[in-house]
Curated annotation (Swiss-Prot):
PROSITE patterns: CYTOCHROME_P450 (PS00086). It comes from Gibberella zeae (strain ATCC MYA-4620 / CBS 123657 / FGSC 9075 / NRRL 31084 / PH-1) (Wheat head blight fungus). Cytochrome P450 monooxygenase; part of the gene cluster that mediates the biosynthesis of diterpenoid pyrones. The first step of the pathway is the synthesis of the alpha-pyrone moiety by the polyketide synthase dpfgA via condensation of one acetyl-CoA starter unit with 3 malonyl-CoA units and 2 methylations. The alpha-pyrone is then combined with geranylgeranyl pyrophosphate (GGPP) formed by the GGPP synthase dpfgD through the action of the prenyltransferase dpfgC to yield a linear alpha-pyrone diterpenoid. One of its GO terms (cellular component) is membrane. Glycans are attached at N338. GO terms for molecular function: heme binding; iron ion binding; monooxygenase activity; oxidoreductase activity, acting on paired donors, with incorporation or reduction of molecular oxygen. The chain crosses the membrane at residues 23-43. Diterpenoid pyrones display various biological activities and FDDP E shows anti-HIV activity. FDDP D and FDDP E show also inhibitory activity of 42-mer-amyloid beta aggregation that is involved in the pathogenesis of Alzheimer's disease. The lineage of its organism: Eukaryota, Fungi, Dikarya, Ascomycota, Pezizomycotina. Its cofactor is heme. This is Cytochrome P450 monooxygenase dpfgJ. GO terms for biological process: terpenoid biosynthetic process. The keyword Heme applies. It is a single-pass membrane protein.
Amino acid sequence: MEDLLDQVVVELHRARSCLSDPLVFTQAAVIGSILFVFLLGLYNYFLHPIAHIKGPFLAAVTPISLIRALRDIHNPGPDNHHYTKRGTSEDLILRFVFGANNILLVDEGEDHKRLRGALQPAFTAKAMRDQQDITHYHVQKTVERLLEAAMDPSQTISLTKELNKLVWGNVGNLAFGEPATLEQLENHEKAKDLHAQIAPILEFFQYLNGNPILGRAARGLVGISRKVFGLSGNILGKDQLRRHIASQQGQKNFLTAILGAKESSGLSFDEIHSNMLLLLMGGYDSSAASLSAIFYHLLREPQQYKRLQSELHHAYSSVNDITCNSLLSQPMLNACINESLRLVPPFNGHGSHRVTTSGTMIDGVWVPAGTLISADFYSLHRDPSCWAFPDEYRPERWLKEHQGPGTPFENDVKTAWRPFSLGPRVCVGREMALQSIRLAVSKIVYTFDMTLANRDFVWDRDAGSHYMWHDFDIAVTLAKA
């Protein structure tokens, strides 16, 4: 027995001496890692509690999802169950920017109800009517800048940059009673670029989020990173918010509406800051990306642009006659907007939406407790079981004359159109965003003939998306219509 123990000690010493050699240690680490990943993959594919939910092989055996399958249900990770069925959409939530609870970061329940109740007064029908003049002002300023550019029809301009300025100024004005500065816009764009660069890490952290220990560590790292980069302070600092609050007497905007609900909703200052930051960033990103995408699709299909322009010229004798309320009854305008929002939903991606607390049956599939459930807007909007010609820009699918029996779109499932999410998670500012988008698109199309200058740009291929769209720029030449 003693000889055996001596032999074991000798072998352990030999192993330690071998591992002290960097080359041997590296080889052992690599071989051990490969073996671990292989065995983990076997477990995930054959023995994991949701192994019966089939999907792309790589997604089923590892948390690294490199394959997108446009199917009703697929398994994008060994602990994840991803749905594209209507009725299960929910927003991807990241804590990389926001330091306190806001309407997107809290689970549904009393906290979510409390925060939603605090924001709701900012988006009532009366609030929207009160804010129309502000949006008209910013759209008109953009039209005036474009008229100057149109004096040289050979000049190529970035329509995206002009639309970004429009939306940023408008959202800031709606939120605080004064336009947000271009410096804030630059800081926001830098933050968005940073988010795009580290998005794969955040996606992996979301996978870890399902583990009680690793998830806590991942959330801690995200919180530390937020403080290191100081993103929120560069876009809307707390001192800056305090100055806005002090200057709100007699004004009507998002901030005054939220302040009016502060006591009844029990909002802390940090929660007010987080929600105002969300309204500024989310309101800008969703509307700015949507406007660029709308003009991209219209200009890729010039006959659709001309058709919309003709409808507007027929409906209004002057661009000054266009009003927010009258645009609700312009079928081609709303069809073009709806179709672009289908192909390019304002926010995209899937993430750690919720974890099942007990086993449940979803759409005929048994999902065990502890499974992360998520949905993907892009996949939902391109699902061939819900849409005819799912990857094509067909605004006519939204027109009444193309929706009856015998039409190509008779089986379209319009309830699968969820660019602003649904249920308790539906975007609280969706109607305000649509109001601004309709006004901007109608006045610009009414006033200008446009040609897409960078026709080699293909949105689906060239634009990036890590929840927020980025790396897109619609360049145009234009002349007064």
